[in-house]
Structure formats: C-alpha cells, structure tokens
Amino acid sequence: MSNLSYHEQIDRENILKLRGLVRDLPPFCSDFFRGIEPRTSSRTRIAYAYDLHVFFDFLHRENPMLSKLEIRNISLEHLDQLSVTDFEEYMEYLKYRCNDKKQEVMNKERGI
C-alpha cells in the first residue's frame, strides 16, 4: 500500500467509501455506478451516491406506496409508478430537511 501515490491512496479510500454507500442503495444502482465509472472521478460518484441516498430516503419516509419497503427493496418498477407530483414533492423536500445526523439542511433554488 505504501507504494501508492497520494492521489492513488485517496482514490482507493474513495472507492471503499463508495462501495459502502452503494451497499445501502437498491441493487440496480450498482449498474449505474459501474456504467459511469470510466467517465467520472471517485469523488463525483460519491456525491451521486449521497444524492441517491437522499432521494431514496425521501421515498422511504414520505411516499405512502414505498414507506413500508426498505430502501434496498425499492425496484425500478416502483420508480416507474412515481408521478410528477412525487418529484415535485421531492424538489420541495430538498429545500429543507434533516439529514441522517439530525442536522438541518437548507438549499436555495440554485442548490437544488
């Protein structure tokens, strides 16, 4: 491991972090991350994983159809059933929410 450059060490740490994040998402998300791997940095993929976690957490907490499912059990078929209203509610949710650490998160229009 000591033969790795600084950037290689950071990339390795990011890859391990991403694996942990993807493990908590629905299985089909793994295909997405494998697909974007050649054209994105590990830090970009981590940011996408956080964004997907926020989205699926919203569905799990706020959507009556999906609230009884664990996040890992949400399927593409479930996503196909979402309406425009569901996405509008998600966009509104992004303006103010509490994260997993019970910290308040506020986004302005530019951050959504």
Question: What residue ranges belong to the model's regions?
Answer:
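N-terminal core-binding DNA-recognition domain of tyrosine recombinases/integrases
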Residues: 29-43, 53-112
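A detector for short, charged/polar N-terminal pre-domain segments
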Residues: 19-23
